[in-house]
């Protein structure tokens, strides 16, 4: 039996990235946009940047520029910023980047997450400010999470391999969205 060698996290991420880019499955999936604010963050420097090639940045920039409003994209905002600017940044994210109608926006499945870097200082005022910001974030998201839990919305069944349920197309037509794609799902297990 061959000896197994432990891989570093960077090597694992590199292998996963290569596998994702192979074949058509990656290119038919949902769009994910990562917005990193504050390039000096520890996670960004140690884990994110080493796994992304310079050419990937150019492709990502070209792709993001080609998106029509990016409304269907899942968005993750990674804040590697000093705590003093969290309030202003999260308010702007809430006002301009989150769906204003999240409850009824299940069709678009727009996801907006905010991740924060560990505190830059242990000063009691800074820690208190971050606690206040997190409480504000939970004040915004808790009612939404409770609503989702109360509704216990069941997924609409649809044919395996299809674009989704016909009700989704009907809703898109009612709100004025015209699907112009040529999506055709290919079962990766039968290739």
UniProtKB/Swiss-Prot annotation:
Q: Name one Pfam family in it.
A: G6PD_N
Q: In which pathway does it act?
A: Carbohydrate degradation; pentose phosphate pathway; D-ribulose 5-phosphate from D-glucose 6-phosphate (oxidative stage): step 1/3
Signal peptide coordinates? none
Phosphothreonine occurs at 10
Coiled-coil blocks: none
State any GO CC term: membrane
What residues bind NADP(+) 1, as annotated? Answer: 38-45, 86
Report keywords, A-Z: Acetylation, Carbohydrate metabolism, Cytoplasm, Glucose metabolism, Membrane, NADP, Oxidoreductase, Phosphoprotein
Which residues carry out catalysis?
106 (proton acceptor)
Q: How is it modified after translation?
A: Acetylated by ELP3; acetylation inhibits its homodimerization and enzyme activity. Deacetylated by SIRT2; deacetylation stimulates its enzyme activity.
Residues at which NADP(+) 2 binds:
163, 179, 185
User: Which cysteines share a disulfide bond?
Assistant: none
Taxonomy, superkingdom:
Eukaryota
- Reactions that this protein is recorded to catalyse: D-glucose 6-phosphate + NADP(+) = 6-phospho-D-glucono-1,5-lactone + NADPH + H(+)
Q: How does it sit in the membrane?
A: Peripheral membrane protein
Q: What class of enzyme is it?
A: oxidoreductase
Which residues in this protein are found as N-acetylalanine?
2
Q: Which residues carry this modification: Phosphoserine?
A: 8
Summary of subunit composition and partner proteins? Homotetramer; dimer of dimers. Interacts with SIRT2; the interaction is enhanced by H(2)O(2) treatment. Forms a ternary complex with ALDOB and TP53; this interaction is direct. ALDOB stabilizes the complex inhibiting G6PD activity and keeping oxidative pentose phosphate metabolism in check.
Q: What is this protein called?
A: Glucose-6-phosphate 1-dehydrogenase
């Amino acid at each position: 039996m061959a000896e197994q060698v432990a891989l570093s996290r960077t090597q694992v991420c590199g292998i996963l990235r290569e596998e994702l880019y192979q074949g058509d499955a990656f290119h038919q999936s949902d769009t994910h946009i990562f917005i990193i604010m504050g390039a000096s963050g520890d996670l960004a420097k140690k884990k994110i940047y080493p796994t992304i090639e310079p050419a990937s940045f150019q492709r990502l920039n070209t792709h993001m520029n080609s998106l029509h409003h990016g409304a269907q994209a899942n968005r993750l905002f990674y804040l590697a910023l000093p705590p003093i600017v969290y309030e202003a940044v999260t308010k702007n994210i809430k006002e301009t980047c989150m769906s204003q109608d999240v409850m009824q926006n299940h069709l678009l499945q727009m996801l907006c997450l905010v991740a924060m870097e560990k505190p830059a200082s242990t000063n009691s005022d800074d820690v208190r400010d971050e606690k206040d910001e997190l409480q504000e974030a939970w004040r915004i998201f808790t009612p939404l999470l409770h609503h989702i839990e109360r509704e216990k919305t069941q997924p609409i069944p649809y044919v395996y391999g299809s674009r989704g349920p016909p009700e989704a197309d009907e809703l898109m037509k009612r709100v004025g969205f015209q699907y112009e794609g040529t999506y055709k799902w290919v079962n990766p297990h039968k290739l």
